[in-house]
Curated annotation (Swiss-Prot):
Entry GO CC: extracellular region; membrane; peptidoglycan-based cell wall
Known outcome of mutating C25 to A/S: Remains cell wall associated, no difference in gel migration, upon overexpression in M.smegmatis
Record's note on what induces expression: Constitutively expressed in culture (at protein level).
Membrane-spanning intervals of the chain: 190-210
GO biological processes: symbiont-mediated suppression of host innate immune response
Protein name (Swiss-Prot/TrEMBL): Protein LppM
Organism, scientific name: Mycobacterium tuberculosis (strain ATCC 25618 / H37Rv)
Recorded GO MF terms: lipid binding
Post-translational modification: A shorter form (about 20 kDa) is secreted; upon overexpression of the whole protein in M.smegmatis the C-terminus of the short form is about residue 187, suggesting it is generated by cleavage of the protein before its C-terminal transmembrane domain.
Chain's role: A putative lipoprotein that seems to be specialized for the initial steps of macrophage infection. A non-acylated fragment (residues 26-185) binds phosphatidyl-myo-inositol mannosides (PIMs). Limits, in a TLR2-dependent fashion, bacterial uptake by host (mouse); this effect may be mediated by nonacylated fragment 26-185. Plays a TLR2-dependent role in host phagosome maturation arrest. Plays a TLR2-independent role in chemokine production during the first 24 hours of mouse infection.
Signal peptide interval: 1-24
Length: 227
């Protein structure tokens, strides 16, 4: 039976590391893309302006159970330094483990859940510990179908963005409707089974036609049939 609800905590809190960066300029940009198969790929940037020449900014650890799906590299752009993590094809169940990439994680929690053909994103961002009014904290989510409702900014029909304000608690919500991949797979299997059955019936019919009785038959008058 196909599951109609699937829940996974995205827990991107580990990306913010707000406590150690509360007094410095902060840049956190997270972008995630949800595929029609309910797999999530994306990119995380966690960076800050260095306090000195030896400051390399916040670090993300790629040592997670699905490390083959995650690539972590140094980030250095526009005077910000830190880490950049790129991940691909994560399941809803794997996403919570991204929190293990940094032990100082705090600040943001997101959840994705499915209810039939509707995927619901809900989140809460507590940035009360961020004192820098110029902190750049941004989340972008791309769905595989048009967003039906959201409290974020729709930059495209399928893409929603939140620019989170420092010093306050923000909430995020969005919904999109697209077919449950489990249901779609079941339907596809049924179609192929139908095609296979139809093809098998065709083969049987052809074989029956080939093996039909080709012996001459007498007409009702007893005369042999004319050709």
């Amino acid at each position: 039976m196909a599951r109609t609800r699937r829940r996974g905590m995205l827990a991107i809190a580990m990306l913010l590391m707000l406590v150690p960066l509360a007094t410095g300029c902060l840049r956190v940009r997270a972008s995630i893309t949800i595929s029609p198969d309910d797999l999530v790929s994306g990119e995380i940037i966690a960076a800050a302006k260095p306090k000195n020449s030896k400051d390399t900014g916040p670090a993300l650890d790629g040592d997670v159970p699905f490390s083959q799906k995650v690539a972590v590299s140094n980030y250095d752009s526009d005077g910000y330094v830190g880490s950049q993590a790129v991940f691909s094809d994560l399941t809803f169940a794997e996403l919570p483990q991204l929190a293990n990439m940094n032990s100082d994680a705090a600040g943001v929690n997101l959840s994705l859940r499915r209810n039939g053909n509707i995927v619901i994103l809900e989140g809460r961002a507590d940035l009360t510990s961020v004192s820098d009014p110029d902190a750049d904290v941004e989340l972008t989510v791309a769905f595989p179908a048009a967003v039906t409702s959201t409290n974020g900014d729709r930059i495209e029909p399928e893409v929603v963005q939140w620019k989170l304000k420092p010093g306050v608690v923000s909430t995020m919500s969005a919904q999109a409707r697209y077919t449950d991949p489990n249901t779609r797979s079941f339907t596809g299997a049924g179609i192929w089974l139908g095609i296979a059955a139809f093809a098998a019936a065709g083969v049987v019919a052809v074989l029956a036609w080939i093996d039909r009785d080709r012996s001459p038959r007498l007409t009702a008058s007893g005369d042999p049939p004319t050709s």
